[in-house]
UniProtKB/Swiss-Prot annotation:
Cofactor annotation comment: Binds 1 zinc ion per subunit.
UniProt key word Metal-binding: yes
Keywords, ordered alphabetically: Amino-acid biosynthesis, Metal-binding, Methionine biosynthesis, Methyltransferase, Repeat, Transferase, Zinc
Name of the gene this protein is made from: metE
Matches recorded under InterPro entries: Cbl-indep_Met_Synth_N, Cobalamin-indep_Met_synthase, Met_Synth_C/arc, UROD/MetE-like_sf
Positions with a binding annotation for L-methionine: 433-435, 486, 601
Short name of one Pfam family: Meth_synt_2
Species, as recorded: Syntrophotalea carbinolica (strain DSM 2380 / NBRC 103641 / GraBd1)
Name this polypeptide is given: 5-methyltetrahydropteroyltriglutamate--homocysteine methyltransferase
Length: 758
């Protein structure tokens, strides 16, 4: 019986790749040093998996930015605006596509969106009429050669062709990206034939099969894999599915002419009993038994029992043991957590530990004595179930006391808008989403305070200095609604979680968000409760520095949930409601302190959608209720804002309207205002601010560009309900580009106001 993983974290336990990437982009190191750091990380991770008992170690899962961007480069699918001449796709062209800048060249970066329902972002492939594809990058072959030299039993991993095209987008109206399928598969054939001679298995990821696949597309899958199997020779192909059940795609997956099928038995444990009776005699079944997306220790007895059922039905030579999906979504190693509460630590497993869990399941099925390991696992499971850390009676009582009126504002939006006229905002009010650039001095002050190297007074003085400067900069720019800039916050979820019961934090629990961006998600281990006010000091201080309206900035309950590792011992909806009650208390405290515009960010509401549309209504019901529970306890004269990332709202616009925020800002510029297409068919009833420039790129957009985007927006959104703002917060940007971009944004709003006056 073989063990394998579907992928491994890329950044390194201490974010080594992040640091080298950012040094390279700044010109502080050269390409040779960046490549060397990548080789060192790959080898370290291959060895780690090998030593943990993994037989087939993935190769090709490492990336300097994103695995979908790697596939774009490998296929030569470089969009025309990047000026690629058709030669090999070099590293600078690769980063140019992702970031929109390379040396003195700038253009619009490729769009980025969430990888299924995870917190990882991928670069969206672009498809054009007349596009040609050819093998244009050799990185996979080079890394496979590296692994072979090191004696690694390597398994190349690629996004499957169906998933690659399904997750892309047409760049010309009326064009069908699937018309390129044959041409794309031709390049895949070349890739498969080249790596097949050097490995025993090739993994092609098709998580799209765990979603609602249109009928005409389903009809083409078999032919694609017939072609790939024909060029693989004796090398065996595995189709990997994950993030959910195959459901109506099960028969299709089982009929593919491949040698192995991976199924996710964490997200969809019930599908095993449907798979086993129908599995072809010659097909190996890979069991995704260890959770690749969450940090909790596995119930090993349960995993072994499930695997035993498969072995009895299939034989051990036709069963593999694996995590449910790539381990990209969890931190590298729990051994790096020295200060975490040892009780909570005993309940956790990171990537390295999950590889060890995979091996324990295999050892048990091979008849090895794993009694001691299982007893330790049993103890951890039982301790967690009974722990007083997990259960808080006061939270349970408050949950039981929630009444229907707590979900509703007192009056309609029209009435509230009249009550909010006292804010005296102009047409097309300008604002930002919340955070401003976090300069080295601010980060250093936070770190020094946390480590006890500076006093609370010194820390407070540094934060107040930043806030004063941020307010002064915004006033000088002419922004209408200000923010305090969030210098005290290392992360929009971690900052709040650190002050809430039921959350804990790691020292080195980093996971990749996109490119070099890493996040350290909180772990929600127990009942959530606010212990004290969390934002009052900084927000009220900022309001004292200006006569203009200032927004209080809070993170909403759904985003707190989606961007955390969530407890798995109760429904997610219950945990979300607990967070909503905690944030509701903060909203009411801010209002009482005189903050009359309060933003409750729900950046993650869209990404929390289940993969299957049939499950959307249930999720959206409790997600919208959680927001309303958070925001509905204020007076009509208090203006509630929310912010969301990504503009794919065509199927959920009515639910967003049900949130009943007075103002919503939505990321829109990177997708060239695709959001407006939704608003043409659905009249959003409240105020809205579609983002007019992309904050993920260092590029400064011109006034003319933003005027054009606002003009487009004004065709479907009445001017009296249109706000002007960037796509997202500005924390990761530098001050010079931030000020230049905001200056142009304010100028664009002023121009449109002038045009509107005739």
């Amino acid at each position: 019986m073989l063990t394998h993983t579907l992928g491994f974290p890329r950044m390194g336990a201490h974010r080594e790749l992040k640091k080298n990437l950012e040094s390279y982009w700044k010109g502080a190191i050269g390409q040779e040093k960046l490549m060397a750091s990548g080789r060192e990380l790959r080898l370290r991770h291959w060895r780690l998996q090998q030593q943990a008992g993994i037989d087939l170690v993935p190769v090709g899962d490492f990336s300097y930015y994103d695995h979908m961007l790697d596939m774009v480069a490998m296929l030569g699918a470089v969009p025309p605006r990047f000026g690629w001449q058709g030669e090999s796709v070099d590293l600078d062209t690769y980063f140019y596509m992702a970031r929109g800048s390379s040396g003195h060249r700038t253009t619009t970066a490729m769009e980025m969106t969430k990888w299924f329902d995870t917190n990882y972002h991928y670069i969206v492939p672009e498809f054009y009429p007349g596009q040609r594809f050819r093998l244009a990058r050799n990185r996979l072959f080079e890394e496979l050669a590296e692994a072979c030299i090191e004696g690694i039993q390597a398994k190349p991993v690629l996004p499957g062709p169906m998933t690659f095209i399904a997750l892309g987008k047409e760049m010309v109206a009326g064009f069908d990206r699937w018309s390129h399928l044959d041409a794309v598969v031709e390049v895949y054939e070349e890739i498969v034939s080249r790596v097949a001679a050097k490995c025993s298995w090739i993994q092609l990821d098709e998580p799209i099969l765990a979603t609602d696949v249109p009928g005409p597309i389903r009809l083409r899958v078999r032919d694609v894999y017939r072609r790939l199997a024909a060029v693989a020779g004796p090398c065996r192909l595995m189709v990997a599915t994950y993030f959910g059940a195959l459901q109506e795609n099960l028969d299709l997956a089982l009929s593919l002419p491949v040698d192995g099928l991976h199924v996710d038995l964490v997200r969809a444990p019930g599908q095993l009993e449907k798979v086993l009776p129908c599995l072809p005699e010659n097909m190996v079944l890979s069991l995704g038994l260890i959770d690749g997306r969450n940090v909790w220790r596995s119930n090993l007895r349960q995993a072994i029992s499930t695997a035993q059922d498969a072995v009895v039905a299939r034989g051990s030579d036709r069963v593999m043991i694996a995590p449910s999906c790539s381990l990209l979504h969890v931190p590298v190693d729990l051994a790096g957590e020295a200060v975490l509460d040892p009780r909570i630590r005993s309940w956790l497993a990171f990537a390295r530990q999950k590889c060890q869990e995979v091996n324990v399941v295999r050892l048990a099925l091979d008849g090895e004595d794993v009694t001691e390991v299982l007893q330790a696992n049993d103890t951890a499971m039982e301790n967690r179930r009974k722990s007083a850390l997990v259960h808080r009676d006061a939270v349970r009582r408050r949950m039981a006391d929630i009444s229907p009126d707590m979900y509703c504002r007192r009056s309609s939006f029209e009435e509230r808008k009249k009550q909010q006229a006292w804010l005296r905002l102009p047409t097309l009010p300008t604002t930002t989403i919340g955070s401003f650039p976090q300069v080295a001095g601010v980060r250093s002050a936070r770190r020094s305070f946390k480590q006890g190297r500076i006093s609370e007074e010194q820390y407070r003085a540094e934060m107040q200095r930043y806030i004063r400067e941020a307010i002064a900069q915004q006033e000088a720019l002419g922004l209408d609604v200000l923010v305090h800039g969030e210098p005290e916050r290392n992360d929009m979820v971690e900052y709040f979680g650190e002050q809430l019961a039921g959350f804990c934090f790691t020292e080195n629990g980093w996971v990749q968000g996109y490119g070099s961006r890493c996040v350290k998600p909180p772990i929600i281990y127990g009942d959530v409760e606010r212990l004290k006010p969390m934002t009052m000091e900084w927000t009220t201080y900022a309001q004292q520095q200006t006569n203009r309206p200032l927004k209080g900035m809070l993170t909403g309950p759904v985003t707190m949930l989606c961007w955390s590792f969530v407890r798995d011992d109760q429904p997610r909806s219950a945990t979300c409601k607990q967070i909503a009650l905690a944030i509701r208390d903060e909203v009411q405290d801010l209002e009482q302190a005189g903050i009359k515009i309060i933003q409750v960010d729900e950046a993650a509401l869209r990404e929390g959608l289940p993969l299957r549309k049939s499950a959307w209504r249930e999720y959206l019901g409790w997600a919208v209720d959680a927001f309303r529970l958070t925001a509905s306890g204020v007076a009509d004269s208090t203006q509630i804002h929310t912010h969301m990332c990504y503009s794919e709202f065509n199927h959920i616009a009515e639910w967003i309207a049900k949130m009943d925020a007075d103002v919503i800002s939505i990321e829109a510029s990177r997708s060239n205002m695709e959001l407006l297409g939704v608003l043409e068919s659905f009249t959003y009833p409240n105020d809205i601010g579609p983002g007019v420039y992309d904050i993920h790129s260092p590029r400064v957009p011109s006034v003319a560009e933003m005027v054009e985007l606002l003009r487009k927006a004004s065709e479907v959104i009445p001017l009296e309900r249109l706000w002007v703002n960037p796509d997202c917060g500005l924390k990761t940007r530098a001050w010079p580009e931030t000020l230049a971009s905001l200056r142009n944004m304010v100028a664009a709003a002023q121009k449109l106001r002038f045009f509107a006056r005739g």
